[in-house]
Swiss-Prot record:
It comes from the Eukaryota. The keyword Coiled coil applies. It comes from Arabidopsis thaliana (Mouse-ear cress). This is Immune-associated nucleotide-binding protein 8. InterPro entries: G_AIG1, GIMA/IAN/Toc, P-loop_NTPase.
């Protein structure tokens, strides 16, 4: 603990993707280039969850700098994937990826498809941990269930092996004299029970409003221990899927062709025209991948809506009927997921070009 307190200073952070320079505070260190010569590896951490649950605030707490836009509004703030790198004391470099309200019921499948492709592009090397952000301030909603189901459908069922549940609102529980265990209690929603079982009970409570430096350091330190546990349990292998490899291959092809053009001695005018053609081709190929993800997302949404309809009907049944319906729902959910994964695998095996 003494060592944790000693290293309580802010982590130097660097934005990987930003369009609004005003979002970067003065304390962000832009001199650190995070080159391949860094002594510690880069670990990609992606934040997912319903809009308003505190994803951006959690990202700011992790990197110890206000680089992610964060407001306590139900409409949310972040509208595109955004990555920030931060050096942790005597630990890995974290590449923290904040996401828009992916899987929010109000967001289009087209937007989600594009943002997932962008997210996977930012996660060079694969995903080392997925943080599912929930809030103790709000009840578990259908959108939370949509997040988990869609994650499994789009990325495969193994994504839960990299899942950590982050509960925000630690200040609320502290004011009420409650621990996270007290909050979860005996009346835990079935969805939450299922999530915690799937992720091996990996969970943590975050207070994103605290001014206590020691507390800030401690909660990040505890999160790093969970991330390290995920890494060890997955044999140091980050999560990748077919879509990730397709994006990686496309970007590597684009980079290689750029280098070949630059080495052929074209005039500046010729080079600019050829580079523009290459860029158009790259954008077209990435757009095709985004459209594939959009189709997958629509499949997931339709299946989830059917599942919600069945659950609503189950609310009006007797206890025995509910038990029978729950068993049928589990079987139905399993079949839907298997069918969707089979359809997506079939699509992904088709040539995009």
């Amino acid at each position: 603990m003494a060592n944790d307190q000693k290293n309580s200073e802010s982590f130097p952070a660097k934005e990987d993707h930003k369009k609004d320079d005003a979002a970067a505070p003065a304390e962000v260190d832009h001199k650190d280039e995070f080159s391949a010569s860094q002594p510690h590896p880069v670990e990609n951490i992606v934040l997912v969850g319903r809009t308003g649950n505190g994803k951006s605030a959690t990202g700011n707490s992790i990197v110890r700098s206000k680089v992610f836009k964060s407001k306590t509004k139900s409409s949310g703030v972040t509208m595109e994937c955004h990555a920030v790198k931060a050096v942790t004391p005597e630990g890995p470099i974290l590449n923290v990826i904040d996401t828009p309200g992916l899987f929010d019921l109000s967001v289009s499948a087209e937007f989600i498809g594009k943002e997932i492709v962008k997210c996977l592009t930012l996660a060079d090397g694969g995903l080392h941990a997925v943080l599912l952000v929930l809030s103790v301030r709000t009840r578990i909603s259908q959108e939370e269930e949509m997040v988990l189901s869609t994650l499994q459908v789009l990325f495969g069922s193994k994504i839960v092996d990299y899942l950590i549940v982050v509960f925000t609102g630690g200040d609320v529980l502290e004011d009420d004299g409650m621990t996270l265990e007290d909050y979860l209690g005996d009346n835990m929603p079935d969805f939450l029970k299922r999530v915690l079982i799937l992720c091996g009970q990996r969970m943590i409570l975050f207070d994103n409003k605290t001014k206590d430096d020691e507390k800030k350091t401690k909660q990040v330190h505890e999160l790093l221990k969970l991330i390290d546990l995920v890494r060890k349990q997955n044999n140091n292998i980050p999560y990748t899927d077919e879509m990730y490899h397709m994006i990686k291959e496309e970007n590597e092809r684009h980079k290689k062709e750029q280098e070949e053009l630059e080495s052929k001695g074209h005039s500046e005018e010729q080079l600019a025209a050829l580079m523009k053609e290459l860029q158009i081709m790259n954008e077209r190929n990435l757009k095709a991948m985004a459209e594939m993800m959009e189709k997958n997302m629509k499949i997931a949404m339709e299946a989830q809506e059917k599942l919600f309809e069945q659950r609503e009907k189950a609310q009006e049944m007797s206890y025995q009927q509910k038990m029978e319906m729950q068993e049928k729902l589990k079987q139905m959910e399993g079949r839907m997921r298997a069918e969707m994964e089979a359809q997506m695998l079939s699509r992904q095996q088709c040539s995009i070009l």
